[in-house]
Amino acid sequence: QVNFTPNWGT
């Protein structure tokens, strides 16, 4: 399980 929160795609 990977918890990745990208700051792009706003």
UniProtKB/Swiss-Prot annotation:
Keyword Transcription regulation: no
Superkingdom as given in the UniProt entry: Eukaryota
Annotated localization: Secreted
Record-listed Pyrrolidone carboxylic acid modification sites: Q1
Keyword entries, A-Z: Amidation, Flight, Hormone, Neuropeptide, Pyrrolidone carboxylic acid, Secreted
GO biological process: flight behavior; neuropeptide signaling pathway
Sites of Threonine amide modification: T10
CC per GO annotation: extracellular region
InterPro entries tied to this protein: Adipokinetic_hormone_CS
GO molecular function, one term: hormone activity
Sequence similarity: Belongs to the AKH/HRTH/RPCH family.
Role noted for this protein: Hypertrehalosaemic factors are neuropeptides that elevate the level of trehalose in the hemolymph (trehalose is the major carbohydrate in the hemolymph of insects).
Record-given protein name: RO-1
Species assigned in the record: Romalea microptera
Organismal lineage: Eukaryota, Metazoa, Ecdysozoa, Arthropoda, Hexapoda
